[in-house]
C-alpha cells in the first residue's frame, strides 16, 4: 500500500459504534443567539433512555451517523454538531418527553427553507430507536431570518393596495371546487364580488383540468373581477391558483396573471414545495402581486399529536419562504383547530415579536425583526352565525373566507355575499361601540337581520349547523 494512502489505528481513530449521548447530549450547553433551536416531542422505543433518544435526534439531524467514521477527524464536530441541551417530561405521558436541540447556523444554507427542513426533519423521523417524533417548534435566529425576504410587503401594504381598513377582509372559495366550466366559474366569481366580498378564490385542487383549463379560468375570472370592481367602486381580487406540475409551468401562469393586471395569485405551498413557493414569492415581490397560500396536505404532517410537525412550524416556514395570506383554521368551523394553539400561531404569522408562551404552545421567543407579516385566513365550514366569534378571535388583520357559507344561500351567490358583508359590518360596528362579541354575538346578528333580508335568510338556513368535535391536537395538561 502506498504511504500516501496507508491508515493506522494508532492515530486516534477507533472503529465501532458509540452511544450518541457521549457526543450529542450536552446539558451544560449555553445556547447562542445564532443557534436554530428545536423542540421535539420524542417517544422512544422501550428501553431507550431519554438522554440517548434526544442525543440521537440531535446527531441524526446534524453531523452524526450510526458508527464512528474516519472523516470525523477532518472537521470540527464541536463546531458543527447539533446538541441536545435539555430534556423535559410531558405531563401525563410517561413514555414521552420534550427534547431541546440546538443547531449551529453554519449547518444551513442562507434563504433556503428547503435545506433547513432537509436537515432538521429530513431523515431522523424514520429512526428505529424512536417510536414517534414530532417537531413542536423552532426558534429562528435573527441572523437567519435576515437571509429571507418573506412576504411581499406585509399586512399594511396590502391594506394600502386594496384601500380597505378597519375590518377583516371577506372571501369566498368557489364551489363546487371541481366540474364547472370556466365561464360558469367566472359568473360565480362576479356574483360574489358584486355582492360585497373582497376576494374570491380557486380551491386548492383547481389547477388545469379537462373541464376548465387554467388560461380560460384566468380570463373569465379577470373579466368578472374588473366588472365587479367597476360596479361597486371597490378594489376586488380573485386568487388565481398558479400551482402546476413543474416550476416552469407555475411561473408561466404567474406571468400571465401579471399581464392580465390582477392583484393576487395563489399557490399550494406544501404540495408545490418550498423551493417552488420561494421562487414564486420572489416573482410576486418583483412584479407587484400579492400571494395567497393554501396549506393543502398540512394535516398529513401536523394533525397527529405524537408524530410529524406542528403547524406553527409550517407557519413560520411560510413566513420565511414568502406569502401574504395563509389558511390557519377557524376554531369554530369544520376543520381542526384548538383556540389557544390557533391564536399562538396566528400571532407568529402577524406579529414582529412573540414571547415564549407554553399556554399557547409557543416554546421559544421569536423575533422576526423586519420580516413582514402574513394575514391568517379563517376558512372551512363557517357561516354568518360564526361571524361574531371569528371577528373576536382573529381581529381586523385577517381574511374570513366563506365558501358554502356564501354559495349555499337560498337566493343565490350575490345575496350570500351580501349576507356575509352585512354580518361583518354589524359585528365590527358593535365591537367598536364596546359590545362583547363573545357574549352578545347572536343578538348582534339578529338585530342586523331585521334590516337585511339576505342576512335573515342566511340565518334561517344555517341556524342549526354546528361542528361539535373535540380537536385531536391539544395543549399538554
Curated annotation (Swiss-Prot):
The active site is at residues 175, 294. Binds 1 Mg(2+) ion per subunit. Its cofactor is Mg(2+). One of its GO terms (molecular function) is ribulose-bisphosphate carboxylase activity. Residues 1-2 form a propeptide. One of its GO terms (biological process) is reductive pentose-phosphate cycle. It catalyses: 2 (2R)-3-phosphoglycerate + 2 H(+) = D-ribulose 1,5-bisphosphate + CO2 + H2O; D-ribulose 1,5-bisphosphate + O2 = 2-phosphoglycolate + (2R)-3-phosphoglycerate + 2 H(+). The modification N6-carboxylysine is found at residue 201. The record marks 334 as: Transition state stabilizer. The modification N-acetylproline is found at residue 3. It comes from the Eukaryota. The keyword Cell membrane does not apply. The basic functional RuBisCO is composed of a large chain homodimer in a 'head-to-tail' conformation. In form I RuBisCO this homodimer is arranged in a barrel-like tetramer with the small subunits forming a tetrameric 'cap' on each end of the 'barrel'. RuBisCO catalyzes two reactions: the carboxylation of D-ribulose 1,5-bisphosphate, the primary event in carbon dioxide fixation, as well as the oxidative fragmentation of the pentose substrate in the photorespiration process. Both reactions occur simultaneously and in competition at the same active site. This is Ribulose bisphosphate carboxylase large chain.
Amino acid at each position: 500500500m502506498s504511504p500516501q494512502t496507508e491508515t493506522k489505528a494508532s492515530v486516534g481513530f477507533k472503529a465501532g459504534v458509540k452511544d450518541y449521548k457521549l457526543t450529542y447530549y450536552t446539558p451544560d450547553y449555553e445556547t447562542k443567539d445564532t443557534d436554530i433551536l428545536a423542540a421535539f416531542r420524542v417517544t422512544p422505543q422501550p428501553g431507550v433512555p431519554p438522554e440517548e433518544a434526544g442525543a440521537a435526534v440531535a446527531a441524526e439531524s446534524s453531523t452524526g451517523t450510526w458508527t464512528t467514521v474516519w472523516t470525523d477527524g477532518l472537521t470540527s464536530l464541536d463546531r458543527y454538531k447539533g446538541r441536545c441541551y435539555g430534556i423535559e417530561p410531558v405531563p401525563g405521558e410517561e413514555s414521552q418527553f420534550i427534547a431541546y436541540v440546538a443547531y449551529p447556523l453554519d449547518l444551513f444554507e442562507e434563504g433556503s427553507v428547503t435545506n433547513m427542513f432537509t436537515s432538521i426533519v429530513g431523515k431522523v423521523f424514520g429512526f428505529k430507536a424512536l417510536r414517534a417524533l414530532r417537531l413542536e417548534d423552532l426558534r429562528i435566529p435573527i441572523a437567519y431570518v435576515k437571509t429571507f425576504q418573506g412576504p411581499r410587503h406585509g399586512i399594511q401594504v396590502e391594506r394600502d393596495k386594496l384601500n380597505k381598513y378597519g375590518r377583516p377582509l371577506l372571501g369566498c372559495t368557489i364551489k363546487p371546487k371541481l366540474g364547472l366550466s370556466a365561464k360558469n366559474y367566472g359568473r360565480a366569481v362576479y356574483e360574489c364580488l358584486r355582492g360585497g366580498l373582497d376576494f374570491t378564490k380557486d380551491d386548492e385542487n383547481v389547477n388545469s383540468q379537462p373541464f376548465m383549463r387554467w388560461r380560460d379560468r384566468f380570463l373569465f375570472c379577470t373579466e368578472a373581477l374588473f366588472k365587479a370592481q367597476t360596479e361597486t367602486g371597490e378594489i376586488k381580487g380573485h386568487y388565481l391558483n398558479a400551482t402546476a406540475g413543474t416550476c416552469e409551468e407555475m411561473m408561466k401562469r404567474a406571468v400571465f396573471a401579471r399581464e392580465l393586471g390582477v392583484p393576487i395569485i395563489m399557490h399550494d405551498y406544501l404540495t408545490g414545495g418550498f423551493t417552488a413557493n420561494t421562487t414564486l414569492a420572489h416573482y410576486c415581490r418583483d412584479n407587484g402581486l400579492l400571494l395567497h397560500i393554501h396549506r393543502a396536505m398540512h394535516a398529513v404532517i401536523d394533525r397527529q399529536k405524537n408524530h410529524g410537525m406542528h403547524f406553527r412550524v409550517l407557519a413560520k416556514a411560510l413566513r420565511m419562504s414568502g406569502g401574504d395570506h395563509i389558511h390557519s383554521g377557524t376554531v369554530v368551523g369544520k376543520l381542526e383547530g384548538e383556540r389557544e394553539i390557533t391564536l399562538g400561531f396566528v400571532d407568529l404569522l402577524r406579529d414582529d415579536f412573540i414571547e415564549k408562551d407554553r399556554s399557547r404552545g409557543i416554546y421559544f421567543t421569536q423575533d422576526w425583526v423586519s420580516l413582514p407579516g402574513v394575514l391568517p385566513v379563517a376558512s372551512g365550514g363557517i357561516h354568518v352565525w360564526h361571524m361574531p366569534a371569528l371577528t373576536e378571535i382573529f381581529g381586523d388583520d385577517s381574511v374570513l373566507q366563506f365558501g358554502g357559507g356564501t354559495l349555499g344561500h337560498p337566493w343565490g351567490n350575490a345575496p350570500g355575499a351580501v349576507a356575509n358583508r352585512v354580518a361583518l359590518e354589524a359585528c365590527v360596528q358593535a365591537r367598536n361601540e364596546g359590545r362583547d362579541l363573545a357574549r352578545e354575538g347572536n343578538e348582534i346578528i339578529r338585530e342586523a337581520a331585521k334590516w337585511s333580508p339576505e342576512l335573515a335568510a342566511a340565518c334561517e338556513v344555517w341556524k342549526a349547523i354546528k361542528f361539535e368535535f373535540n380537536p385531536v391536537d391539544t395543549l399538554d395538561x
